[in-house]
Amino acid sequence: MNVVILNGPNLDRLGKRQPEIYGSTTLADVELELFRLAGQLGVDVECKQSNYEGELIDWIHCAADAGNPVIINPGGLTHTSVALRDALAEISDGPGFIEVHISNIHAREEFRHHSYLSPIATGVIAGLGTIGYELALRYVVSTLNS
């Protein structure tokens, strides 16, 4: 099984940008831990990050065509992108996707409280830091193996 893990705009800045909110862990650290965990769980993960909405959508289309589940931290696109939601709807109708946020978006500015993606997500993990990615991967593997 292959699980696609996508990170949206500004997540390449983890460990540098607003560490008081997002912590000091880098995206490379997160990906390294996900590769390690995937090996333990017997799955392959494909980690990608882009600051460009269209590139994320292209990757979602590839995941849909391959029948792969997606774990996504859409960053700020969470609150603005109908196009991303439309692409993820195809994943939602198939293997499903988990929406992950490092910070608790509901405890932050009002404009961050709304997600265009949450209503069609299999699940949402927010506010648990970078361990949220690991929890999402464990969930995806457990549901696909059952």
From Swiss-Prot:
Keyword Amino-acid biosynthesis: yes
Protein's pathway: Metabolic intermediate biosynthesis; chorismate biosynthesis; chorismate from D-erythrose 4-phosphate and phosphoenolpyruvate: step 3/7
Residue numbers annotated as active site: Y22 (proton acceptor), H101 (proton donor)
Reactions this protein catalyses: 3-dehydroquinate = 3-dehydroshikimate + H2O
Catalytic activity, EC: 4.2.1.10
One example GO MF annotation: 3-dehydroquinate dehydratase activity
Keyword Mitochondrion attributed: no
Chain positions of site Transition state stabilizer: R17
Keywords, alphabetical: Amino-acid biosynthesis, Aromatic amino acid biosynthesis, Lyase
Function, in words: Catalyzes a trans-dehydration via an enolate intermediate.
Record PANTHER family: CATABOLIC 3-DEHYDROQUINASE
Similarity field: Belongs to the type-II 3-dehydroquinase family.
Self-association state and partner proteins as the record states: Homododecamer.
Protein name (database record): 3-dehydroquinate dehydratase
Organism expressing this protein natively: Corynebacterium diphtheriae (strain ATCC 700971 / NCTC 13129 / Biotype gravis)
